[in-house]
Amino acid sequence: MRAAASASAAVETVNGGRRRVGRGERGTVRTKVRATVTTGRGMRVVRAGAKIDFEDAGLFELPYAPVAETLLPKGPWKVVEGGVCAAKGFKVAAHKAGLRATGTRADCALVLADEDAKSAGIFTTNVMCAAPVTVCKDQLAGKPTARALLINAGQANAATGDAGMADAKETAAELSKSLGVPEEDILLMSTGVIGKRMKMDKYMPGISVLAENVESSVAAANAAATAICTTDLVRKTVAIELEIGGKTVRMGGMAKGSGMIHPNMATMLGVVTCDAAVSSDVWRDITSRAGSASFNQISVDGDTSTNDSLVCFASGEAGNAEIVDANGAEAKLLEDALTAVCMGLAKAIAWDGEGATCLIECNVSGAGDDEDARVIARSVICSSLAKAAIFGHDPNWGRLACAAGYAAPVKSRFSQDNLKLSLGPHQLMNEGQPLDFDAVAASRYLKEVTDVHGVCVVDISVGDGPGAGQAWGCDLSYKYVEINAEYTT
């Protein structure tokens, strides 16, 4: 499942600096929003009963990450349009309620299943988890299905105490009333500034607007993927189609994240919709494994957020016989597809890391088992020294070897005499011995990768064991410090 060595990309100017964005679906949209009111600050507010135009450039325009073109693993599926609306049985909406401190972009989204959908989730390991995370975990522990997911950007509703929990429950109650579905069928996600109460006077009216505007269009799916972003410079969405049990199954996803990204869920939100018929137990098991192989294998800056959440829905509307055998071929195929979608989105988050000029992919083989290999790969992509060296086009393989060596915990430590290490096409170490290599050519490889915001590939073998794993990160630039010195988290 290795990404290409570089990504074809366009270049745009962002905040005075050059930033690469994926070529393809650009979100260049031009339409009108009807039934708006202009406030004293010039902010357009859509009132209840109004029709939202999901192709309004002012609200929903954001470049597209090259998930389908470069980052999605290959498999027996094809890419289709539609994002989270590609699967049968789902509608979405997006809206600007006014929750962001600055900017004109929409800031809330709704994903709605036509009927009860099998639901599974994985969440942050941070003990300071946000109120919406607690609500989600409680809801999913109580029943295997859900109908709606309400997401907001701009305010995290984390470290807000009892009042924050009350706000979360109030938003769920408002959506329940607007949709006519039970509160226990509603899930919540939030992302944004930590430690401040939600702007309930703005959010609550926006909830009914969302409920009135759900649709299953490509434009709505792209609008939702844009609305949930914070410091992201690109929206992250993808959809695929494959055959399971003689039926066409579709799966789509969207994610947000650019900073505060670290293994064991990071400030990332992910949503996947699927129309396969699958038992709750199987769906939860494969969601857990797919998340472990993808979102838990990325890091931008080593900070694990309070709000990290991945929620996956399965509507069952594809018409296939329900998948109940966890060890069967159909369950394996469904898991492969879900893992691919999650990997594509997770890699897009690392690709879009704050200030990044490239994605770093570390592939580890020869470990005692897959988990050991993943631990080693994570250690390498988390190394600030290695990340800085790659940004500086310095083929400093010692930093890579060092990071592999201190990886912990692993069940079986590897011998340095077995270490093999390559940077792109350049082999730097074999069986623990440094090799003569063309440092100028290796530096040129790094420059070529960063010039196109491509993929820097690090291959490591630690022995002859059966374990293999991957992790993804990004380089560490001056821009990362600038962004986070100026942005309140």
Residue ranges and their predicted role:
Residues 16, 41-43, 246:
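Intrinsic-disorder/low-complexity loop/linker signature
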